[in-house]
């Protein structure tokens, strides 16, 4: 296969289809989404069988546990894919909304209209649910999509794509509104991220290496996050029962996600009381703690097993482990915690546990992250939990889309000017 010609063809078809989907009405888009959801429910057994084949090949290829976790589907996750499509269908259509319309002294009215971005290229590893989520979000926001999933999920992605095509056909929309790249040749990625005549934005979802490559080589804008070094800070005015519960969920509910907590900061004034409780819980869950000298001394004195303790090195404060490991540090106070987070964090999601309203407000204002959380788990940093329906990704850049990216993040705004024969004086 001539990969360059193949990708150029996909790009041309997507650009043409983007004009059709941009003018599609809400009812037509929702009909496509609901048909896709019904097809996924009907074909659940086929999707799970394809996923089982992908899992078998991935294990044989030696993929790590974090990727296998993201790759695996279950009856529950397939049902969740269908539910996500139905939720997106139920969301308000942002396309065509006019914000801030106001009269100017000249008599004209000026406002901003929400419009699709155009053609979105989405590159992702594992996570077959992204095929459905991305297709749905792009479609509802009036965009065409070119989806390039990882080779490890090829069979399942193809099965999901068949359900997507069925929905497009039922709604009378061009099949090229959502196209799945069928080749596993990595050169396809290089072509996709440089097709500035056909692609308006790239959304990568995958490991750090993939994101760095795309960021360095892309010739079109990229909506991205590099990694997720999320923090929980336990303040000296925290409810310790809440703190233990929050850290347990934030760290151990699921290891392979970007909103999993990787670093625990504890105020010095409460460390002797908080760390033994948190350490016992983490050790019981099989989590290794890489601590500063002060935290290790407290944990050792509390009887936390030695095989779960290890001295932290400088790189641990930056690390996204994606596994049963957490960095632990005792800090002076809220100011020190915020300095640490803003220095070592990834600007993804960071949380404070405190009963002090003023400190919570400071944390919200001063921590420079896409999501900041008070008295709750970092695991809530998710489009579904935020009421966006599904999300197409998470952005840690300071652009129009920051944090979980849903429908509005896949639109732009253009100025609209309304007059009645007005001319400029």
Curated annotation (Swiss-Prot):
One of its GO terms (molecular function) is NADP binding. It is found in: Cytoplasm. InterPro entries: Ald_DH/histidinol_DH, Ald_DH_C, Ald_DH_N, Aldehyde_DH_dom, G-glutamylP_reductase_CS, Glu-5-SA_DH, GPR_dom. It comes from the Bacteria. Its EC number is 1.2.1.41. Keywords: Amino-acid biosynthesis, Cytoplasm, NADP, Oxidoreductase, Proline biosynthesis. Pfam families: Aldedh (PF00171). Its main location: cytoplasm. GO terms for cellular component: cytoplasm. It catalyses: L-glutamate 5-semialdehyde + phosphate + NADP(+) = L-glutamyl 5-phosphate + NADPH + H(+). Pathway: Amino-acid biosynthesis; L-proline biosynthesis; L-glutamate 5-semialdehyde from L-glutamate: step 2/2. One of its GO terms (biological process) is L-proline biosynthetic process. HAMAP family: ProA. Catalyzes the NADPH-dependent reduction of L-glutamate 5-phosphate into L-glutamate 5-semialdehyde and phosphate. The product spontaneously undergoes cyclization to form 1-pyrroline-5-carboxylate. Belongs to the gamma-glutamyl phosphate reductase family. This is Gamma-glutamyl phosphate reductase. The lineage of its organism: Bacteria, Pseudomonadati, Pseudomonadota, Betaproteobacteria, Nitrosomonadales.
